[in-house]
Amino acid sequence: MAAHRPGPLKQQNKAHKGGRHRGRGSAQRDGKGRLALKTLSKKVRKELSRVDQRHRASQLRKQKKEAVLAEKRQLGGKDGPPHQVLVVPLHSRISLPEAMQLLQDRDTGTVHLNELGNTQNFMLLCPRLKHRWFFTSARPGDLHVVLDMAKVADTILFLLDPLEGWDSTGDYCLSCLFAQGLPTYTLAVQGISGLPLKKQIDTRKKLSKAVEKRFPHDKLLLLDTQQEAGMLLRQLANQKQQHLAFRDRRAYLFAHAVDFVPSEENNLVGTLKISGYVRGQTLNVNRLLHIVGYGDFQMKQIDAPGDPFPLNPRGIKPQKDPDMAMEICATDAVDDMEEGLKVLMKADPGRQESLQAEVIPDPMEGEQTWPTEEELSEAKDFLKESSKVVKKVPKGTSSYQAEWILDGGSQSGGEGDEYEYDDMEHEDFMEEESQDESSEEEEEYETMTIGESVHDDLYDKKVDEEAEAKMLEKYKQERLEEMFPDEVDTPRDVAARIRFQKYRGLKSFRTSPWDPKENLPQDYARIFQFQNFTNTRKSIFKEVEEKEVEGAEVGWYVTLHVSEVPVSVVECFRQGTPLIAFSLLPHEQKMSVLNMVVRRDPGNTEPVKAKEELIFHCGFRRFRASPLFSQHTAADKHKLQRFLTADMALVATVYAPITFPPASVLLFKQKSNGMHSLIATGHLMSVDPDRMVIKRVVLSGHPFKIFTKMAVVRYMFFNREDVLWFKPVELRTKWGRRGHIKEPLGTHGHMKCSFDGKLKSQDTVLMNLYKRVFPKWTYDPYVPEPVPWLKSEISSTVPQGGME
């Protein structure tokens, strides 16, 4: 009987390869006592079943809903601050007094008027709705008033024109408010009832389509009758609040009443008593207080007078005459400050924060003791190693020159200490860059005219010829910078090794090292720096959110005693300027280096140079400073930009008081007529003095004679010594070739160069030199009040023919 044999289609299993896998014992021996990770069971990991997951999600939704409702009840309720509403008309045809009169509904509740200067504010108490509102108003052309009031307003009520929505001034106001950060807002249309019935529906449709660009998916409310005003009030009370991050972590206050007590020594300085409702966070008397537009001050004590606008007043008989319910409360609030005062908290000198903003530099701090023998021996060894590296240095090279010569990616800097000369160099380079082309195009600019209205005397009176000439020169410099970035003509009257003695070459701008603590200016001895800014910011914010602070709670009506305040603050308040105060977080009064990411505003076309004085609105502060512009990259070195370009985001670097982000940033430029023009918008990135801004200078030469991989280059230098000085620096061309200087030829600056390929006759030889630059200390907390904004009738554009 024959045995069964497997066929060709029988499954063949893989043979077991024994000995290739470790056993448990060998694995334990190799582990040397380390235990393997334990796989957690579902119960230990606390995984929930589907039913429990749904129940948990519903509980979270319920908690969020209750938190929103609690916030709505507190804002404007009996235990919270009044609901502050800022009314902003966005068109010149809108009647602001008529709108404010409609909102003063006597049938709804009690109205308390407060008239100061040009502003008309009133408090509306509505016990039936269990809500109280505080209405303020601002014209869109009054830039500081609008931006300051928007910082503390809970809701902004925009009044729109039924036909156009907003005009040019209103559009400019919206651009500034969107850049600063909008709180909760509502749109209302005034005057639509005056149109025929057939046109009202079409007008509302066209208006909704027009405002969709700024306010997508927002509902338009009407404000023409008392009934529509009541519906608007209900909408304001029931809206979900949008938060601004920079104010939610700080205590702030809008002044309802102000009193001034001059000091005995000087009548121009004294104690300022500010009364208002605490908002944001708990107000501590030991913290510093920043009055917007005036600076930082210390508080003496906090009083707790009675609330002058209670939602449910007790013991007050109703007046028979309804007109008696209208009260002028400007003086009553001050009287209440004097009667029934209760001292809530007094400042503790041991715990109170100091007003010191700058470090007092010690002139003896830079001295060192005599080095030890070990340090001397290490220095000798280092010199021996470095002597091997600089073997290619030509004869006559000084020790200073050898310190910054690059080889194989290593470098050291020889930047000087004459920092005042740094500030002048920027202007000198601009003049040198435009010297040649200005001589060629001088006749062309002299024969240019602005338009066909030369004989119009009225038009000529509006044109400032000197300002036009300066603006034309700026446009020319900006165009030259775009066409030839960082290129500079080598001076003939000064040796290049002297003119560019503070510059160095880098083998690679991205990877070559640069010590951020090297050759710092004297101003860096005056500023503060964090060891780890991110961790400090997180710890301060965590303390604000979790730690209970002693002081005035949110919603309390308090009186702050602020010391050493100038009398001009009270005078401006009595003229109608709103007074707003913010409590500072720790370290926010100290000076440091702020880096802000900004992008140029599309509506501005004027050139803006670096180190030009601008007006900053950073969070709750505003100040004047001269920023540096640099590229926004992730590297450790950032190239300086000589102009604020429109095609990319840049980083503005200034000396300013510390502010913890997030904070919005607005850059303005003051014109000759006093108006502030919006230049750029952005946000605060970091507080980091070690961020290096590197200025690049490009020297250019022309190939005179071209061989296979050799070329004779001229016009880059004009003497033999300069060629020898810059010989170690690498060359490049606009067409991508790289090379080095071999030797000088003659005494007129010609030099023999070798490249990695053959040059083209139309190519240009370039040499990159670098220097670290620092901002100018031009910080000024005083910002002049701007003239109401109006759209300029004279176009600031330059004819294209003049720039070609």
From Swiss-Prot:
GO CC, alphabetical: cytosol; nucleolus; nucleoplasm
SMART domains tied to this protein: AARP2CN, DUF663
Region of interest called Disordered, as start-end residue ranges on this chain: 1-67
Keywords in alphabetical order: Nucleus, Ribosome biogenesis
Signal sequence bounds: none
One Pfam family in the UniProt entry: Tsr1_G-like
Localization annotation: Nucleus, Nucleolus
A Gene Ontology BP annotation from the UniProt entry: endonucleolytic cleavage of tricistronic rRNA transcript (SSU-rRNA, 5.8S rRNA, LSU-rRNA)
Residue stretches of biased makeup (Basic and acidic residues): 46-55
Keyword DNA damage recorded: no
Functional description taken from the UniProt entry: Required during maturation of the 40S ribosomal subunit in the nucleolus.
Protein name: Pre-rRNA-processing protein TSR1 homolog
Organism: Homo sapiens
